[in-house]
């Protein structure tokens, strides 16, 4: 009678007889911060395909995490360049638009409260070369103007 109770395995008892192990998430197994399980759920729920492989959410989470880290790194640099400690949408826009590859990836994306890149058409700028050439051909200023003469004489 006692032997029948020993053969039965409960939820707390494992095959080896040891205690139950703590569950480890797929994000931890992959060494990621982004949620692999949630991304897998979104892939299934979104009906992008009939079936979703077990490696697909892990790969997608890794790609998304890399892109987020890249954008945040560049936005942090832009914030530091502007002597700010907090990243704002303007810094994100400057980071994305000044990077060639990210700019190409996010070409059709509008970033709210990002503004625009500072850009002045060179045609509209005053011509420095002409000013410098004109100043060189003009007579140098008279020394009388350069030195102050006493007004009382």
From Swiss-Prot:
Keywords of this entry: Chromosome, DNA-binding, Nucleosome core, Nucleus
Q: Where is the composition biased (Low complexity)?
A: 132-147
Stored InterPro entries = Histone-fold (IPR009072), Histone_H2A (IPR002119), Histone_H2A/H2B/H3 (IPR007125), Histone_H2A_C (IPR032454), Histone_H2A_CS (IPR032458)
What is the residue range of the motif SPKK motif? Answer: 149-152
Is the keyword Nucleus assigned to this protein?
yes
A Pfam family matched in the record: Histone
Q: What's in the domain note?
A: Contains one SPKK motif which may interact with the minor groove of A/T-rich DNA sites. Phosphorylation of this motif may regulate DNA binding. This motif is reiterated in both termini of histone H1 and in the N-terminus of sea urchin histones H2B, but its presence in the C-terminus seems to be unique to plant H2A.
Its function, per the record, reads: Core component of nucleosome. Nucleosomes wrap and compact DNA into chromatin, limiting DNA accessibility to the cellular machineries which require DNA as a template. Histones thereby play a central role in transcription regulation, DNA repair, DNA replication and chromosomal stability. DNA accessibility is regulated via a complex set of post-translational modifications of histones, also called histone code, and nucleosome remodeling.
PANTHER family per the UniProt record, alphabetical: HISTONE H2A
Q: Which family does it belong to?
A: Belongs to the histone H2A family.
Name of the featured protein: Histone H2A
